[in-house]
Curated annotation (Swiss-Prot):
Short name of any one Pfam family annotated for the protein: Radical_SAM
Protein name: Biotin synthase
Stretches assigned to the Radical SAM core domain: 61-288
Catalysis: reaction(s): (4R,5S)-dethiobiotin + (sulfur carrier)-SH + 2 reduced [2Fe-2S]-[ferredoxin] + 2 S-adenosyl-L-methionine = (sulfur carrier)-H + biotin + 2 5'-deoxyadenosine + 2 L-methionine + 2 oxidized [2Fe-2S]-[ferredoxin]
Cofactor(s) this protein requires: [4Fe-4S] cluster; [2Fe-2S] cluster
Lipid metabolism as UniProt keyword: no
Similarity comment: Belongs to the radical SAM superfamily. Biotin synthase family.
GO molecular function terms noted in the UniProt entry: 2 iron, 2 sulfur cluster binding; 4 iron, 4 sulfur cluster binding; biotin synthase activity; iron ion binding
Gene transcribed to yield this protein: bioB
DNA repair as UniProt keyword: no
Protein source organism: Cupriavidus taiwanensis (strain DSM 17343 / BCRC 17206 / CCUG 44338 / CIP 107171 / LMG 19424 / R1) (Ralstonia taiwanensis (strain LMG 19424))
EC number: 2.8.1.6
Entries under SUPFAM superfamilies matching the protein: Radical SAM enzymes
One of the GO biological process terms: biotin biosynthetic process
Amino acid sequence: MTQAHTVTTISAESLRQTARPHALPDDAKWRVDDVAALFALPFNDLLFRAQQVHREHFDANTVQLSTLLSIKTGGCEEDCGYCPQSAHHDAGVKAEKLMALEEVLDAARAAKANGATRFCMGAAWRSPKDRHLEPVMDMVREVKAMGLETCVTLGMLKAEQAQQLKEAGLDYYNHNLDTSPEFYGKIITTRTYQDRLDTIGYVRDAGINVCCGGIVGMGESREARAGLIAQLANMDPYPESVPINNLVQVEGTPLAGTEALDPFEFVRTIAVARITMPRAMVRLSAGREAMDEALQALCFMAGANSIFYGEKLLTTGNPQADRDRALLARLDIRAEGYAG
C-alpha cells in the first residue's frame, strides 16, 4: 500500500510518554483504517499479497520451531479474562513454585533434540521480584549455552531488570499487547495498556529483541484486530517477533463460552501481520490444537513462519511433535536448523 504522507512511527521513548497510546498520529505509517482495508481485501488477494511480501524477506518453505515451557505456573495477580493462571479465576490451575534449573535444562535438551531452535520460558507473575530474576538469568545463560535462542515472559519489568536480562544474554522478551487499546479494558483491569508499552520500551532500550503480539477470538471486532496490528506495526522498530494467538477457551475463565472466531478471519490476521511487519517472525501460537491441517497450511501461506512445538503451550494443549513433523513433511516445509 503506497502512502503519500510522511511516515511516523512510535519510538521506545514515546511508548512510555504517550498518555493515550491508541491516538496514532494522522501521518502514522499504518493507520487503523489502512489496516482495516487490508482485512477487507478479497481473501485470495490478501493471501497473494502476504505471500509476496513473505518471499521478499524469508524462505517461504522454512519455519522456526519454538518450545514454550511454563517455569512458574499459576497464582498470577492479574485478572486477564483469557488466562487460567490468574488467581482471580477458578480454572483448576494450582499455583506452583519456580522450577529448578535442572528441570528447565532437561526440558530444553528435549526441545532441542526434537528440532526446536528457540526455547521460551514463561512465569505467571504480574512482575518479577528482584529475588526471582537471578535464577531466571541462570536459566537464560544455560539454555543459551546449548545453542538455543532464548525468550522469557515474566510480566512487567523495570528498566534495570531489562538491563540485567540483557547482560545475561537474553535474546527476546515477550510482552504482548493482547488486543487494541479500545477493547483492552474488557479483557484486563489490573494492568493498563500503558503499563505494557512501558515494559516494551524498557526492553527495547536494553537492546533485547521484542516479542509482542496479541490474542484474537476474544469477542473483539475486526476493527479491534486492525487496531492491535496498527499499534504493533507503528512501533519503531516494529517487534522482531509477533505471536498471533487464537483464544483457547478454558472453563472457569471469564472468556469461556465466547463465540469462536471464523477460521478464515484468523488467517486474515496472520496475513495482515505479515504485510504490515514484513521482516518480523510471525508466530502461529496458541490455538493450534483446535486447527485442522488445512487451516494451518493456510496460515503458512499467509506468512506464518514459526510454530510453538511440543506437548503443552503453558497450560493449554498443543499438537504433538510427531503430528507437527508429519504435517510439515506433507507440505514440504523444512524446520529451521533441524536435520532430523
